[in-house]
Regions:
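Beta-strand secondary-structure signal
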Residues: 2, 59, 84, 99, ...
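Short coil-to-beta-strand transition motifs
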Residues: 115-125, 190-191, 197
């Protein structure tokens, strides 16, 4: 199943979000017996997730074999997961790779952070600059970037962009404190660019 997830929608039940999730909607429309259960009963059919405030196309599976096969494509990096984000400032390089560990922040447990802790999980993001925009009174310009995920860590793009000092515009967790620099955006400017697709 290919789904268009709206911003603000949580993918699966978790503390504080027991109902009204994408997983709940899948069960309502398909029935629990017609969804993959590889991820457990609280994530029926879910192949991969998107952060609550990230919108775009997602994949869900109607049976365990399909769910396993799609997740294997993600693990082996066969699925192309590209995102578009607008970040603060002008990124000097036209393209690059960010390869770090990511773990939960020791200062704020809501956040993730780049970490060299041995228990941090490897996270790899490549980026390509699409366009640079002029500066304003409140910011030193913006860069429209295409990001390609080779791993799928929580808040990965948001953490990596912040790590290189180019936080996503409108990001309430990792962004700038001055809301005027977000140009009136009330949510993070981060979208999945296209449906994950298999490339040979």
């Amino acid at each position: 199943i290919v789904l268009s997830k709206q911003r603000g929608l949580v993918c699966h039940p978790a503390h504080g979000h027991e109902s009204g999730t994408l997983a709940n909607a899948l069960v309502y429309h398909c029935g629990i017996d017609h969804l993959g259960t590889v991820q457990g009963e609280d994530r029926p059919g879910i192949v991969h997730r998107l952060d609550r405030d990230t919108s775009g196309l997602m994949l869900a599976a109607k049976d365990d074999d399909t769910q396993r096969a799609l997740q294997n494509l993600i693990r082996t990096r066969t699925l192309d997961r590209r995102y578009i984000t607008l970040v603060h400032g002008h990124i000097a390089m036209d393209e690059g790779t960010i390869n770090t560990g990511i773990a939960r922040s020791t200062r704020d447990r809501v956040k993730m952070a780049v970490s060299d802790d041995p228990f941090a999980r490897q996270a790899i993001t490549t980026f390509k600059v699409l366009e640079r925009f002029d500066s304003t009174r409140f910011d030193d310009g913006y860069t429209l970037v295409e990001c390609h995920l080779f791993t799928g860590r929580t808040h990965q793009i948001r953490v990596h962009m912040r790590h290189i000092n180019h936080a996503c515009v409108g990001d309430p967790l990792y962004g700038k404190c001055d809301a005027r620099a977000d140009q009136g955006l009330t949510r993070q400017f981060l979208e999945i660019a296209a449906c994950p697709a298999c490339h040979s």
